[in-house]
Structure formats: structure tokens, C-alpha cells
């Protein structure tokens, strides 16, 4: 997809860019694959804020995505490429020959009319999903499972991809987008190709109001708060934080402080840590 620029008719327009949506083929989603989506505004079931800076935004409907890709041996044809307001990647509507309709993440270069397949016997081509053990070394993949049958959990954002590096017994070595090299069970599935809409990261929001349309609320600096609200708060005028290192709102060290638990169960699957 390309990036659309605007004439600087207003200050908000001056630096704003949007997607040109050239790949999108319809603006009418498949009704049978929609579900209601209520606003959470970052609150949990007790009404307490667990994720800050969320709230408002345009009303959305959830698109039910097939992350499991378990329609084995049944050919499907790409009917549409669609925009999904709930994720950075585009989605593709697949019509299977048995009458089933499903949405999948749209990989790069997937086009309307192309045929896709799932299962161990599927060919190595864009959009097909198969167990990692059946994918050749060097292949670029996305939507990777961590447990067989659970559905893809890794590499789902726009423009991301992973690469199969090798096979060791019942595990497959995969290099993730971050640079981390990880062991994944060979029975886990992945889809071939890179996730599409790779120009998503180049989009400039341009103005505060557009962030609010996306459901993002302002981020206030701790140094301008009161001491009751943040460890950096208080003081006369523009004061230093008064601590030897920056702190989170809950008094924990931040900015470079490692938060991953030591001796975590999944450590044994990480062959090389991500790039710093």
C-alpha cells in the first residue's frame, strides 16, 4: 500500500499522512463474521484502570479472524481484501469450496482470486498454512502458534515476518521480528509469507484529534503531576525528579529496568535474546 499526503490547508493537515487503501476491494464486511465489541476504556471487571491512555474512539465491530487455519485439505479462494479497524494488518475473506467463509490475516502480495490451502500437504506459497515441520528452512512465515491447535499468537502485526532457521528434533528454530531466536514445537502451524500493509508504520497521525478517533487518550508526564499522583511529581516549578533513576507511576524503576521474571518457564525455548 502507498502513503497519501495532504496539502497543508490547516496545521492538522500539514504533516498528516494516511493509507491510500489501494489494496482494499470492499468496504462491506461479511455480516456472518462480525461480533459486537463494547468499549472497555482500559478498565477491568472491577472498573479499575489496568491500561492507561485508553478510552473513546469510533464505534467498531469485531471481525472474527481464523488464527487456527484448520480447514485442512479444503481449497479456498480469496474473495476480498478488507480493512480491519481492530488491527494494523488488513484481512482477507476466504470462500472455501465446502461453503465455509473465514477471515484470515492478509499476507503481502495476496490478491483476490488466489487459491489458498491449509494442512500438512499444502504447497509452500503465499497464504497457505501448514505445520512448521513441513516448512523448508529459510521460508518467511507469520501467524505462528505457540501450542498446537491454539491458533497463531506470534507475528500478526502489519509488515512483520519471521524466518524458519532450522529443525532440532521436535522443535523448529524461528527468528522473530525482534531478532529473538526461539524454539517452537514442530507441530505448531504458521502461515507462509509476510503480513501485508507494511507501510502502516510510516503513517503520521498529524493531530491530537485523530488519536482520539483511535481510542487513545493523552499521556501526561509524571513531572507535571502532584506527588500523590506520581513519584516524579511536586516541587517548585520545573524540578528534577529527585530520584536516582526514573520511576513508573507505581514507584518501580523504569527506562531500561528489566521487568521479565528470572527463571521464567519459557526461558528454555529462547536460544538468543532479542536485539536491544
From Swiss-Prot:
Query: Does this entry carry the keyword Ribosomal protein?
Result: yes
Lineage: superkingdom? Bacteria
Q: Which GO terms describe its biological process?
A: cytoplasmic translation
Print the keywords alphabetically.
Ribonucleoprotein, Ribosomal protein, RNA-binding, rRNA-binding
Where are the compositionally biased (Polar residues) regions?
A: 7-20
Q: Name one Pfam family in it.
A: Ribosomal_L2
Q: Where is this region: Disordered?
A: 1-20, 219-276
GO cellular component terms attached to this protein's record: large ribosomal subunit
Has UniProt tagged this entry with the keyword Ribonucleoprotein? yes
Question: For this protein, what is any one GO molecular function term?
Answer: structural constituent of ribosome
Q: What does this protein do?
A: One of the primary rRNA binding proteins. Required for association of the 30S and 50S subunits to form the 70S ribosome, for tRNA binding and peptide bond formation. It has been suggested to have peptidyltransferase activity; this is somewhat controversial. Makes several contacts with the 16S rRNA in the 70S ribosome.
**Subunit text:** Part of the 50S ribosomal subunit. Forms a bridge to the 30S subunit in the 70S ribosome.
Q: Tell me its family.
A: Belongs to the universal ribosomal protein uL2 family.
Q: What is this protein called?
A: Large ribosomal subunit protein uL2
